[in-house]
Amino acid sequence: MHAAAGRYREARHSLRTPASAQSRRGLDWMNFFIADVQTGFGTFVAFYLAESGWSQGQIGVALSAAGIAGMISQIPGGAIADAITWKRGLAAIGILITGVSALLLGLAPNFILVFFAQILQGLTAGIITPAIGAISLGLVGRSAIALRAGRNYRYAAAGHALTAALMGAAGTYLWNGAIFFCAAALCIPALIALGFIRGDEIDYARARNATRSNNRVATGRVADLFKNHKLVLFTAATLLFQLADASILPVMGENLVAAKYDQAAIWMSGLIIVPQVVVAFLAPWVGFHSEKRGRRPLLLIGFGLEPVRAVLLAFTSAYPLLVVGQIMSGITGAVIGVLTILVIADLTAGTGRFNLAVGVVGTMSGIAASLSTSATGFLFQAFGPRIGYLPLAAIAAAATGLIWLFVSETKPEKYED
């Protein structure tokens, strides 16, 4: 890891405008505080609604509302992130919307409030994700983005683990709605951390993955991205992965409630925390070794573990083995989370359409996640976990096969920032 840190410093100092320690730390801690606020309390929604007497089908519909909103928002959000210089302002808007959605969820498990809050939370996917990607790339450039992405995911995972524990404790020892008031409160330090990132250090051309001669504001067209066959194939693989993966943890939460575990919120927190601890340890390693050994070998590991995890969960409900499944989830999360940004950066180099491409991939993933949570909710309700998990394993295996057969190495021999 000392070697990785050395490579990161060397790459950073090679940039035209190296980012200050203040900006780097601000980005670190924004990732820490926003990670669980943006995605983690979404996992608690399934548990919260199940405790409130909602059926699996109703919960699936509620979760799908967030997925559909996220799907709609990501392409325009990515295009906006490419077009504007106000990257920090875009992130701030997303954080504020997330806080409002958390407060609405905490008020009452009323269908209209829950549905509206889920839509608001989903919309932030098209704002916060491209904003963080643009800020990161703008601060460090492509020559250091692998290690910066690993650092982003390390802080995000550590924040996810800690705040999931706090939110689980709030739900157990106060009341279930306290989970969401805790999530809303975490938006405040996220905004403070964002304020430490210096706007004058975010290089506009780098933030869009544009060349210096292509530094004008250009409207990215989705049609142009679909001419990039390798990007299309990678997007298809991530779509299949999300179709298999997105519903697994919410279903595990519902099953904990059905099994009538004492203090189920704490047990659910454990299942959320375990993969985040794994991601926190592995993400910098993934970033470093993706530079040393390339993206493809790590992608095959990340995608290949998902069908194994689904098969394991199909044949056991013992809590220790659920933890094993979540360790696998942490490995896949570290690999795919870090490498998705890197592969997109590789494949859009010089186009100025990096954030639009992130939005397109995110939209496809959002479609898959939305279909997964709604369809599997009814599937598990009708046939139970054993039958429900096996189709997910088959879909994950298909995603792995697509990477194996059609997605070659994307890492360039030399970077041009």
What are these regions (language model features)?
Residues 4-24, 201-234:
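Juxtamembrane intracellular "pre-TM" segments in multi-pass secondary transporters
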Residues 14-67, 232-233, 237, 242-256:
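Helix-loop boundary and gating motifs at the non-cytosolic
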Residues 49-50, 80-81, 169-174, 256-257, ...:
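Interfacial helix-cap and linker-helix signal at transmembrane-aqueous boundaries
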Residues 73-86, 282-294, 380:
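Helix-to-loop junctions at the C-terminal end of transmembrane segments
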Residues 89-103, 297-312:
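Structural signature of the two symmetry-related core transmembrane helices
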Residues 112-120, 320-329:
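Paired small-residue
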Residues 119-156, 343:
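Cytoplasmic helix-loop-helix junction between adjacent transmembrane helices
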Residues 171-185, 378-396:
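A membrane-interface helix-boundary motif in multi-pass transporters
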